Regions:
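N-terminal glycine-rich phosphate-binding loop for ADP-containing cofactors
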Residues: 1-394
Length: 394
């Protein structure tokens, strides 16, 4: 089917950026939010963003004006979706809220409209249960900020029509994004599945008293990272990684719920930059990070082994192909390389030994070597020769 009209539901950080991308791509867009103040703020932010694009030469002044003319704003769901070919849900990451939006949108949209969710973690098959036509529901996971990040993960639910996946991927390309098609639905998809294991690791480093946030962030920067993990948690909001781990503790493994430090900080409303305090003091608008030597209690190999383990899980579960896992991690995390290319330079034995050490040290099954690595088949997995496990998560 041909996509001409796009409705974006939710005018927050993700929604307004997604609307901008579609408008610049030549689509007629309606941005919907039930809160008028959110729509007013979104309009200002889109105009400012397009002005920056003009200044950087990404679009001409005329192209920016044309894009703005293609965006309409409404607080009425019916007005937004009644003539839409594609509806993109971009409301906050709550199962109940997203299911409510998908139910209403699918009831009011044309029968053949594609209903896409921008969820970052929630299984599409779970969300699609709320829709009138589950076969028209697909995951379309943009990364933040969508105007800068090129990756879009395209996720089929158990009932999704293959043509819906294909059309969603084609539309992603037309707005200048790089779509990665998952082979099947799985919690947190690719990039965030790998990020979640890293997040759990950094929480447990604090739980075990191994190092402090400044020491770990100093270590991260010594390894060439622009921002350490705790500064990043503060910057995006500590509730974001915690919500992800909380969902995965229910959908994938209770082990993700071991992130007690993140949970406590969310309970105490110490969310980072947006509340003024998290792992660091943000009262001046930027993190006040004490200068300390890097910790030597963790290593780059710890993180590489964890990433490789999660990548191999995705492959053996039949969620994604090795090349797509690599590309998703590189594009989704702005990294110079991904776990597949790293694994090619390491032996199965050294990765297995490191994972066994981490699983014991942190008393965490997430870090235990996955089946393929335990059986010495890491190379088969990363080179695409591994048959997916029949009983893997879906």
């Amino acid at each position: 089917m041909e996509i001409k009209r796009v409705a974006v539901v939710g005018a927050g950080d993700m929604g307004h950026g997604i609307a901008q991308l579609f408008a610049v791509g030549g689509y007629d867009v309606i941005l919907m939010d039930k809160y008028p103040e959110m729509l007013d703020k979104a309009k200002v932010r889109i105009e400012a963003s397009l002005q920056r694009w003009v200044e950087r030469g990404k679009v001409t002044g005329d192209q920016a004006k044309a894009a703005l003319s293609r965006i309409r704003y409404t607080k009425d769901m019916g007005e937004a979706v009644s003539k839409a070919d594609l509806v993109v849900e971009a409301v906050p990451e709550s199962v109940e809220l997203k299911m409510s939006v998908l139910k209403e949108a699918s009831e009011l949209a044309p029968r053949d409209a594609i209903i896409a969710s921008n969820t970052s973690n929630i299984r599409i098959s779970e969300l699609a249960k709320a829709a009138v036509r589950p076969e028209r529901v697909v995951g379309m996971h943009f990364f933040n900020p969508p105007t800068a990040m090129k990756l879009v993960e395209v996720i089929p639910g158990e009932s999704t029509d293959p043509s819906v996946v294909e059309t969603t991927a084609e539309v992603s390309e037309r707005i200048g994004r790089t779509p990665i098609r998952l082979l099947k639905d799985s919690p947190a998809f690719i990039a965030n599945r790998i990020n979640a294991a890293e997040t759990l690791f950094f929480d447990l480093v604090l739980e075990k008293g191994i190092a402090t946030p400044p020491e770990v962030d100093s270590f991260a920067k010594s390894q060439g990272m622009p921002m350490g993990p705790y500064e990043l948690f503060d910057f995006v909001g500590i509730d974001i990684p915690w919500d992800s781990l909380k969902y995965l503790s229910q959908a994938l493994s209770p082990e993700y719920g071991k992130a007690a430090t993140l949970r406590k900080m969310v309970e105490e409303k110490k969310l980072g930059k947006k509340t003024g305090r998290g792992f660091y003091d943000w009262s001046t608008g930027r993190a006040n990070i004490p200068e300390v030597p890097p910790t030597d209690k963790i290593s780059l190999m710890d993180l590489l082994a964890i990433d490789i383990n999660e990548a191999v899980k995705l492959i053996e579960e039949g969620v994604a192909r090795p090349d797509d896992v690599e590309k998703a991690v590189v594009l989704g995390g702005n990294r110079p390389f991904g776990p597949i290319s790293v694994a090619k330079d390491l032996s199965n034995a050294e990765v297995k030994a490191k994972l066994e050490e981490l699983a014991t040290r942190f008393d965490c099954k997430i870090f235990a070597p996955t089946r393929a690595i335990t059986e010495g088949k890491m190379r088969d997995a990363i080179e695409g020769r591994l048959s997916p496990a029949a009983d893997g998560p879906a």
